[in-house]
Design a protein with these regions (language model features):
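Short acidic, Gly/Ser-rich segments with clustered Asp/Glu that frequently serve as metal-coordination loops
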Residues: 34-48
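Short alpha-helical segments and helix-capping/turn motifs at coil-helix boundaries
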Residues: 22-23, 37-40, 73-77
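A short acidic-Thr-Gly-centered motif at the start of a beta-strand
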Residues: 20-33, 78-82
């Protein structure tokens, strides 16, 4: 199930995700001790571009948080969750963490699959093994990840397609 936490109301109803309050989202997230972490941003530079969404969850449930629309109090709830003793998993989390640091959020327990992949292939020629999430999904799971939607968030906002991609 995909949950979207946003104060920007959708014009059209969809069966692809559920619009949820922060309280409902936290009821899904709080039981998790191991949680996936990802974000979507306006660009690559955390000092000049904005954090747009934070995605948290597991295989069964994904929560997409519209960072641009939630209240200061809701941001504090997300901060407290991310700074808890949970283990957060992701790919290339160094990128996501820089945007979180600018927001004053400092997760304590991080497991970055890209760093693990780099350590596994340390010393091998770089051309031997690409380190992207797309490459890892193909190498380990034989799954092709379509990243073309990622560029649409800046111009189109949180469309149904973008929410589903972010939760992916």
């Amino acid at each position: 199930m995909i949950y979207l936490v946003s104060h920007n109301k959708s014009l059209f109803k969809t069966d692809k995700y559920v619009e949820a309050t922060m309280e409902r989202a936290m009821s899904v997230l709080l039981p998790l001790k191991l949680c996936q972490l990802d974000s979507e941003t306006q660009g690559l530079d955390c000092h000049t571009k904005d954090l747009l969404t934070i995605q948290l969850g597991n295989r069964d449930n994904q929560v997409v948080i519209d960072w641009t629309s939630i209240t200061k109090e809701e941001k504090q709830i997300v901060k407290d969750y991310l700074e808890s003793d949970r283990l957060f998993l992701g790919w290339n989390l160094m990128f996501d963490l820089t945007f979180l640091y600018v927001q004053g959020i400092y997760p304590k327990h991080i497991w970055d699959g890209m760093i693990v992949e780099q350590l596994l292939y340390l010393g091998y020629p770089a051309s031997m093994r690409e380190k992207s999430l797309k490459a890892a999904a193909w190498n380990y799971l034989n799954i092709n990840i379509d990243k073309t939607v990622r560029g649409k968030i800046i111009n189109d906002g949180l469309t149904t397609e973008v929410v589903i991609y972010a939760a992916g």
